[in-house]
Amino acid sequence: MRDLILFLSLLHTIFASLFSLKPPSQDDFYKAPAGFKAAKPGDILKTRKSPNKPSSLYAPVDVQNSWQLLVRSEDSFGNPNAFVTTIIQPKNADPSKVVSYQNWEDASNINCSPSYGSQLGAPLSTILTQLDMTFIVPPLKSGYYVVLPDYEGPKSTFGVGRQSGKATLDSIKAVLKTKDFSGINDDAKVVLWGYSGGSFASGWAAVLQPEYAPELKDNLIGAALGGFAANLTGIAESVDGEVFSGFIPLALNGIANEYPDFKKRLYEEVKPGAKADLQKGAENCLAASLISYPMYQYFTGPRRVFEKGWSLLEDKTIGKTLEDNLLIALSKEHMPQIPIFVYHGTIDKIIPIKDSIKIYKNWCDWGIGSFEFSEDKSNGHTTETVVGAPAALTWIDARFAGKPAVEGCSFTTRASNFLYPNISESAASYFKGIYQTILRSKLGSGVTSDDVSVNGLRSLYHT
């Protein structure tokens, strides 16, 4: 593992020196032009070739082309805004197939945006975006265009459902208008895919589509959701005081970026000595927060950040704001109209599987057309990221091939999602290689703990 870390650090140093990048906070391309409010959601405000090639683990990804669009959208309250989305064209591009891949950005700082962290020359602060980029290589090799929306928008609203869902949908609307330079057909089929924080944005896009983007009805053909983040408060309960407690300040500040009243109440309730640490959540990207705040107690224990503990969620402003951003709390009217595939590890200690199962039961009881759930008995959150990916790709391939999705609901428990039917040999080999390289283990050797990536990241930052 140390050899890998040293190698990645060397790659980063080399490419960072060769390919300079302006962070979004200093890049005028990210700023909406005068009069942009008159445009419609999904309209393209600006277009450019991506400043640098896309990269995965700080090595260039071999693609035909890459563009960035500034897209008109709106926030949770319908106020106009604009965000950047990235289109990646593979060498053997099929103009009829697009994967909208929602990265696990999980941060409340615009300089953590996927459009920035996915390129050569990106800083070490975005290393988890570079890791996440390994998952788009197989779809690109299959000839699928890949789209990476900065779905958190210009305010970096991590944990805000409607902003994330609307931006994801407006990104697709915009991409389908780019045939003149990207080659993508305006009637192309699109599949949503995301893991963890990416599943949050993808899930919200799926539930909002019938009302917010009915024009995409014939384009969207499914959503693959891994480590499905259906309940933010359930995640907070799971990670508070544990290895991945660094998620909490990122989400709280992301929500605060969208809801001023929530922010005011939140910071009124912070213990004076803990305010600076909470504010760091508005500055850090995901990796830095995870390695800086493991085992941190926000709602439990004698040294908790909030004196009121979990009773803080009973506050009218805080409680209602959080509930408004829970997929699991939505009514029948927000049930997806597209096929859904969820893959989730039984022993996930970050996003408890029980909430994914609850939303499965809700949507099935309400008569969803197609929902396939694949539970992995052997893996937690970090390892299922890799182990479940070939299953997701197999499901996505089937949608693009025009094969029928399951009718109604299907729940299957497997020893491992590597055993999902019809996984291609190339996909299995690719992801087994990632598993063994990144997680420093062979499959089946018992590496299922959700602390492996934190240890690796800490080693990287202290190399």
From Swiss-Prot:
Alphabetic keyword roster: Disulfide bond, Glycoprotein, Hydrolase, Lipid degradation, Lipid metabolism, Secreted, Signal, Virulence
Primary subcellular site in the record, as a coarse category: secreted
Catalyzed reactions: a triacylglycerol + H2O = a diacylglycerol + a fatty acid + H(+)
EC id: 3.1.1.3
Subcellular location: Secreted
Any one GO molecular-function label of the UniProt entry: triacylglycerol lipase activity
Entry annotation: catalytic residues: S196 (charge relay system), D348 (charge relay system), H381 (charge relay system)
InterPro entries on file: AB_hydrolase_fold (IPR029058), Lipase_secreted (IPR005152)
BP GO annotations: lipid catabolic process
Taxonomic superkingdom: Eukaryota
Disulfide bonds: C112-C285, C364-C409
One Pfam family of this chain: LIP
The protein's role, per its UniProt record: Secreted lipase that is able to hydrolyze both the neutral triacylglycerols and the monopalmitate ester Tween 40, allowing the use of hydrolyzed products as carbon sources. Has broad lipolytic activity, which may be important for colonization and subsequent infection, therefore contributing to the persistence and virulence in human tissue.
Protein name per UniProt: Lipase 6
Organism annotation: Candida albicans (strain SC5314 / ATCC MYA-2876) (Yeast)
Gene name for this UniProt entry: LIP6
